[in-house]
């Protein structure tokens, strides 16, 4: 069994260093630890809320690391809104999926991206998308490919921690995001 007291995570130009007071164990078998696999009881509302917060924080951390690890010279930040004020996440995700398919068909290549849905106070959905290493595409062309509402695209310049910028859009308190993919 191995132990360690420090951990470093490198995500692009960002380095996270963790130092632990007690040793962290690795290379162990889960079967030895889980000897009492029995029925599990329903979590209390307090525990559910704590678990949601942990899950949300873990997702934001993952988004931050993914973006920082994949950012490139031609990366763009894209915001997609709906003219119809869509509030149904399944419908919005379907429309985004169709946009992605049309966009990849237009470009002739698969795009590398990370997408985060965000809800307004009225429950309307819009998307924040980081497009990694994307060639120049005219705004008008992108607008016609989206065709569901307003778009805004910006080149990512002079930003050291783009992942932190993107992860702040992740909505923690929205009930629609419970048990849903957050990025």
What do these predicted regions represent?
Residues 17-19, 129-134:
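Short, charged low-complexity intrinsically disordered segments located at boundaries
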Residues 1-51:
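N-terminal extension/subdomain marker
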Residues 33-125, 132-183:
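Catalytic residues for metal-mediated phosphoryl-transfer on nucleic acids/nucleotides
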């Amino acid at each position: 069994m191995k132990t360690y007291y420090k951990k470093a995570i490198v995500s692009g130009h960002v380095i996270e260093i963790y130092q632990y007071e007690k040793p962290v164990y690795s290379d162990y078998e889960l079967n030895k630890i889980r000897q009492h696999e029995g029925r599990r009881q329903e979590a209390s509302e307090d525990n559910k809320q704590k678990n949601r917060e942990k899950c949300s924080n873990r997702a934001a951390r993952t988004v931050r690391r993914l973006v920082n690890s994949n950012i490139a010279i031609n990366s763009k930040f894209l915001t997609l809104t709906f003219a119809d004020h869509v509030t149904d996440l399944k419908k919005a995700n379907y429309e985004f999926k169709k946009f992605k398919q049309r966009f990849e068909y237009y470009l002739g290549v698969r795009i590398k991206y990370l997408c985060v849905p965000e809800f307004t106070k009225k429950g309307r959905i819009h998307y924040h998308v980081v497009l990694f290493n994307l060639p120049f595409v005219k705004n008008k062309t992108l607008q016609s490919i989206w065709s569901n509402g307003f778009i805004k695209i910006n080149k990512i310049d002079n930003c050291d921690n783009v992942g932190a910028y993107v992860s702040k859009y992740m909505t923690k308190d929205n009930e629609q995001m419970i048990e849903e993919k957050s990025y």
